[in-house]
């Protein structure tokens, strides 16, 4: 992974990219009802929103959305500008897919334990994916992935949270603060100190602005659930944030039938031609596969009587356990028809 302690030259004003942009209205907060500080067991946590409905349901006009899409295209890809490719994804070794899934699970679970916002967890996963898109990790250095996960969550908290924890608060006995700080520096330099990251959440209000007021809130929350349900298998740099948001909304809006081009147009209006519909449908299909797997897993757990708290294993599981993880296969029963991108009209 390279020498994290190597001397690097940072920009003249690097801290400007780490300024927290909180405005006090957190759309993606952990459930405040549970004040035990433990964040639940096994990553059990609920999605909730601020009481200020006008924040969640703020109207966005087409001009604003067009500006967001234009800026996204200039950035070049999902998250940090690294564009994913399905053929390259198929070439990723299975152990790396499983190791990444472990890292994402740890980030989401620890994020809940600290009661950070959901956006913080997503930003941390984005840092992880951007780093892995630029640096290779040897199979015999899985410990470095765990250290990387801590560094990504720590940096995301410094960007997104008002009170980010100190490194000792992560309570990882196997690593000292100096090692974590070196990994943080390696992440910062690898990502070129570009730490302000666009997320799919920025687009949820825009894409639901034309829906009925009484259904928008439920659709946004359902879309957020879809995004986090698929975060272990869909790289945040594989699709642009707008693509992920739109695919999640299409799933949240209609559970029974696959959307068509007319429904896509009804969501984004005249701006649909600025989107890569092929990528939207590809992302939709992957999310639906994960939905099928989640439903199958939930059914199997319910029928077996196993507590949901035990899903995902112990927090102290070794990274090597990811190598032996069994990849679930999508159940062939009751699967929705996969989409194919239609011709532009």
Swiss-Prot record:
Could you mention a single GO BP entry for this protein? G1/S transition of mitotic cell cycle
UniProt region (Disordered), positions on chain: 1-44, 313-345
Q: Which UniProt keywords apply?
A: Cell cycle, Cell division, Cyclin
InterPro entries this protein is in?
A: Cyclin, Cyclin-like_dom, Cyclin-like_sf, Cyclin_N
Q: Does the keyword Cell cycle apply?
A: yes
Q: Which domain of life is it from?
A: Eukaryota
One GO CC annotation: nucleus
Biased-composition ranges for Low complexity?
Answer: 1-17
Q: Does the keyword Nucleotide-binding apply?
A: no
**Where is composition skewed (Basic residues) in this entry?**
334-345
GO MF annotations, alphabetized:
cyclin-dependent protein serine/threonine kinase regulator activity
Please report which protein family the annotation says this sequence is part of. Belongs to the cyclin family. Cyclin D subfamily.
Q: What is this protein identified as?
A: Cyclin-D5-3
Gene of origin? Answer: CYCD5-3
